């Protein structure tokens, strides 16, 4: 067995100890053992200052072993071949090595000097936080309890306030009491790390506080200050970092600046004694205009880092688009993310040279040149010399101003599209054509509902132009009418026209939400109930895909509490789920369908019905099913009229196109004569049932006949459906053409 230190000599010394209840063994040779015995264990395994546990290498596995062995009698703890009996208790310490490395200060070891970073110009400019910085300075200028805590939502710029304070100290723009102060950010995780033995953390905290008292020029900054509550606690006592700091915080011996979020500040509020020693400073989210100012202040830093240029339009777009489309984050953080990510994406288009690859190629060329020179092949040596010159020029090449890429508003829009799946850029490019042709495109697929299509197209135009409220959904409509007239079909086609795919539609059948507790299915279960950790079906899907159409079928079947929940969505475009997250519906289109009230006016449905009177009658019946405040929040209540025979003839063509699309997979094509179409309408016409009976009629008279004919004659691919003896018959196209030619009868 070789020595674990030098890995050369044979290990003749075996040391045993117990660390954290586990038995550890070190195998050393005689020389290495003498070095450790004399106190020079820093030479072994790079252990550093093992006696106090503050090693430069905190993850060294031998630190705790050396700490445990340091207090033992080495003469009794080692033997040449047989393991000694483990000794309890601590003996006197061995002589210290005078050449041992002196430990760094606690603040230097566990902290980062923000003031020094400000002197070197390494922090970004702090813009628009003068009031918060002024408030922090006022609290720090107090005699006691001079410990400000910055609280605010994630990403609003709490840490930037502390950096602004450090910059003001460097500039001398602070009161006399704060002159020459040093703002040092303390890493609580590193402070707790390596304190596995009871009492080590308390000793380390005491040394830290003693050092701060001696220096008397330290303002300690703890990010995520709620971590000090319970930090270092053994679990069976209250001796954590928060309790250790309480006396010093109350007497003003220690100046502390903290930062935490609103939710996590509640952890500190639970400890009233700790909370009273701190003075909260609220950091609010900046406005869009303030965010633009902040972005312009840090613009140069990101341009230098990414080697790009930002246009003024890109800066403004980053603020406006992030505020409009990114809902889960806060300004200015989400706007800075757009700036940074767009710069990163554009930076990848630059053709930078890998320095390591160039150095490797230069070294290879140097070697080959020397070999050619020694071989007196001077022509080849000259070739490698020229190659080295070109490589060095390439190594020193810098991107000129003309080659620097420029980030425009279009680049910012692309980043927003990637993050939110909302086609921001396409909205502007295709908006005019889409809005002009929206009604015609919908009428091509939804037959007989021209009035309803025109109303919804006008409402969407108003919303797109910006005449609607900014926080309301794109549109909210209630489709009312008898069954089978195209209410759901219009919603599908609308999703396809607006969002490019009918899959963007989020559909709910409200017959599944007839119970009071079914509200939890939409927004999530309340705390304490099964399924609390799971997200709601509605809120989660909208949060993941905010640009979508929400279809609520048969809304009158839903429980009243479910409809009450939609009052806030229709009015304010927002809803809070069971987890407390606010979900935005500003980019959603909400459509609800209902046939409520149509049963009482069926007698007036038909060819000669007075449409004006029927409309008033249906809308009047809705009051029996929906509350006035619910109906009053829609952008429009659209009634669908019953379908006429002429409408069904057009619908037959659409349904037959679907049949041809299905059988086209087998290379079959079907042609239907006009007489057969009229027969299908006669068989499937029912004013009270709409177009659904027509689908069943086509299935029975067309699809079944095609299946029978194709099974008997699989070689025929061109089929025709004609009316023969008042029956619809499927035959081969060529055969049908020959018969009609002989009889001189028109095909249709």
UniProtKB/Swiss-Prot annotation:
What organism is the protein native to?
Answer: Lactococcus lactis subsp. lactis (strain IL1403) (Streptococcus lactis)
Q: Where does ATP bind?
A: 152-159, 481-488
Q: Which InterPro entries match?
A: AAA+_ATPase, ATPase_AAA_core, Clp_ATPase_C, ClpA/B, ClpA/B_CS1, ClpA/B_CS2, ClpA/ClpB_AAA_lid, ClpA_ClpB
Read off the lineage from the record. Answer: Bacteria, Bacillati, Bacillota, Bacilli, Lactobacillales
User: Which segment of the chain is annotated as a signal peptide?
Assistant: none
Check the record and name the CDD domains matching this protein: AAA, RecA-like_ClpB_Hsp104-like
What protein am I looking at? ATP-dependent Clp protease ATP-binding subunit ClpE
- Listed GO cellular component terms? cytoplasm
Cite the residue spans of the region called I.
107-354
User: Any idea which GO molecular function terms this record carries?
Assistant: ATP binding; ATP hydrolysis activity; zinc ion binding
- Segments carrying the region annotation (II) are 407-598
Q: Where is this region: Disordered?
A: 74-105
Q: Does the keyword Transferase apply?
A: no
Q: What does this protein do?
A: Could be necessary for degrading proteins generated by certain types of stress.
Induction field: By heat shock.
Q: Where are the zinc fingers (C4-type)?
A: 3-32
Query: Pfam families per the record?
Result: AAA (PF00004), AAA_2 (PF07724), AAA_lid_9 (PF17871), ClpB_D2-small (PF10431)
């Amino acid at each position: 067995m070789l020595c674990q230190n030098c890995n050369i000599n044979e290990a003749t010394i075996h040391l045993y100890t117990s660390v954290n209840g586990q038995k550890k063994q070190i195998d050393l040779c005689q020389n290495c053992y003498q070095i450790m015995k004399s106190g020079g264990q820093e030479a072994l395994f790079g252990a550093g200052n093992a006696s106090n546990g503050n090693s430069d290498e905190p993850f060294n596995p031998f630190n705790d072993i050396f700490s445990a062995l340091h207090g033992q009698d080495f003469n009794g703890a080692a033997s040449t071949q047989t393991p000694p009996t483990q000794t309890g208790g601590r003996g006197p310490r061995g002589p210290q090595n005078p050449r041992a490395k002196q430990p760094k200060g606690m603040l230097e070891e566990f902290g980062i000097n923000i003031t020094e970073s400000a002197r070197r110009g390494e922090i970004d400019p702090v813009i628009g936080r003068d009031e918060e910085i002024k408030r922090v300075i006022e609290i720090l200028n107090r005699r006691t309890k001079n410990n400000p805590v910055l609280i605010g939502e994630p990403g609003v710029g709490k840490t930037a306030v502390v950096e602004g304070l450090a910059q003001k100290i460097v500039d001398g723009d602070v009161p006399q009491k704060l002159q020459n102060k040093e703002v040092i950010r303390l890493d609580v995780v590193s402070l707790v790390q390596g304190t596995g033995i009871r009492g080590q953390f308390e000793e380390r905290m005491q040394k830290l506080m003693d050092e701060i008292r001696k220096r008397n020029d330290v303002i300690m900054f703890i990010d995520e200050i709620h971590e000090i509550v319970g930090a270092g606690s053994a679990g069976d006592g209250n001796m954590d970092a928060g309790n250790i700091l309480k006396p010093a915080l109350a007497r003003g011996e220690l100046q502390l600046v903290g930062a935490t979020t609103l939710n996590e500040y509640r952890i500190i509020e639970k400890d009233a004694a700790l909370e009273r020693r701190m003075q909260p400073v609220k950091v609010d989210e900046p406005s869009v205009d303030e965010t633009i100012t902040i972005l312009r202040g840090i613009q140069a830093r990101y341009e230098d880092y990414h080697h790009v240029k930002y246009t003024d339009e890109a800066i403004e777009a980053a603020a406006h688009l992030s505020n409009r489309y990114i809902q889960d984050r806060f300004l200015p953080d989400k706007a800075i993310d757009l700036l940074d990510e767009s710069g990163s994406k554009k930076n990848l288009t630059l053709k930078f040279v890998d320095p390591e690859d160039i150095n490797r190629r230069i070294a290879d060329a140097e070697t080959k040149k020397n070999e050619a020179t020694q071989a007196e092949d001077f022509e080849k040596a000259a070739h490698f010399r020229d190659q080295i010159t070109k490589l060095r020029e390439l190594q020193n090449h810098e991107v000129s101003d003309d080659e620097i890429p420029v980030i425009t508003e279009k680049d910012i829009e692309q980043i927003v599209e990637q993050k939110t799946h909302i086609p921001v850029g396409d909205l502007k490019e295709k908006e005019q054509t889409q809005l002009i042709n929206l009604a015609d495109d919908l009428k091509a697929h939804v037959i007989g509902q021209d009035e309803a299509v025109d109303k919804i197209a006008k409402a969407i135009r108003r919303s797109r132009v910006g005449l609607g409220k900014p926080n309301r959904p794109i549109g909210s409509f209630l489709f009312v009418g008898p069954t089978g007239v195209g209410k759901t079909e219009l919603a599908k086609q609308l999703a396809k026209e607006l969002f490019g795919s009918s899959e963007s539609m989020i559909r709910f059948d409200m017959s599944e939400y007839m119970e009071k507790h079914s509200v939890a299915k939409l927004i999530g279960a309340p705390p304490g109930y099964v399924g609390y950790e799971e997200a709601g079906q509605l809120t989660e899907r909208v949060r993941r895909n905010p640009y979508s159409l929400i279809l609520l079928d048969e809304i009158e079947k839903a429980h009243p509490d479910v409809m009450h929940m939609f009052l806030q969505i229709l009015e304010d475009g927002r809803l809070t789920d069971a987890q407390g997250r606010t979900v935005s519906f500003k980019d959603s289109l909400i459509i609800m369908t209902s046939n409520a009230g149509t049963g009482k006016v069926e007698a007036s449905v038909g060819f000669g019905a007075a449409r004006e009177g029927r409309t008033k009658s249906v809308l009047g019946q809705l009051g029996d099913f929906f509350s006035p405040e619910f109906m009053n929040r829609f952008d429009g209540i659209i009634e669908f009229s019953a379908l006429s025979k002429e409408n069904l003839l057009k619908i037959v063509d659409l349904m037959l196109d679907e049949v041809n699309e299905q059988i086209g997979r087998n290379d079959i094509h079907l042609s239907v004569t006009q007489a057969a179409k009229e027969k299908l309408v006669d068989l499937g016409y029912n004013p009270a049932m709409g177009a659904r009976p027509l689908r069943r009629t086509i299935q029975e008279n067309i699809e079944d006949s095609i299946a029978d004919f194709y099974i008997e004659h699989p070689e025929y691919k061109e089929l025709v459906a004609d009316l023969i003896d008042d029956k619809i018959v499927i035959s081969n196209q060529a055969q049908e053409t020959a018969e009609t030619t002989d009889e001189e009868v028109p095909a249709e």
